Amino acid sequence: RGHKLMMSAVKEYALAVNLPVLQPERVKDPAFMEEMKRLSPDLIVVAAFGQFLPKALLDLPPFGCINVHASLLPAYRGAAPIHYAILKGEKKAGVTIMQMDTGMDTGAMLEKVSVPIGPEMTQGELHDELKEKGAALLLQTIDDLSAGTVTAEPQEETKATYASLITRDMEHLDWTLSADTLHNQIRAFNPWPGTYTILPDGKRLKVWKSHVLPGSAEQAQPGQILEADSKGFHIACGTGVLAVLECQPEGKRAMAAQSFVNGQQIAVGEILS
């Protein structure tokens, strides 16, 4: 409700420079395949496309089909590699340009670039950095393919990991987990889909930013509020303590945690679930 369908930046640019735009619901559609044959592309570039290309399309261009994938393959094949890199506490991520085959991100690797993941970096921040790095790497790879200077490197199947679709149940914060794990979850799901906890009154509180504090709270129950003052609030975890820096009550905008504490009178000793 209230959401408007908007064209992508790629389509907007293509229309502006009079490039043909094809948007088949199914890439296996015979009419689409015939049009692709008529266009006779030298190379097909794929990015964030949610369908498998049929072999007939993969074999069509003389330089093949290449995919821009936001992970250091063979790690995190699949739909959500950026989320999972942060969720799993990785210290670096990257972009791989790969030659496509009929599998899911299984093709030979052409070129890679890596970036460090800082301890407070969010999924949105990593996405934006990889977007810039990936675009530059794609242009370089196309030049190298044209010059015949790129060497395809097969992936090691024994090192493959997968980044499956993000589901709604992954948004809930389980305070029995460690502070590090919860901090990674919050970073991984910012800005989408977000994480939440349940307040003592039963309402949801989204948590957007956090920080792992030194020390522990072994005598406290997981989810228990240890401090609530002008600086925000600290929560006991299964291991360690997590400081909430930014949150969002139901029906309101995101705010600094200290603003939430000042307005809600959240009390030390209360339990979040």
For every predicted segment, state its role.
Residues 1-191, 240-243, 249, 261, ...:
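One-carbon transfer enzymes
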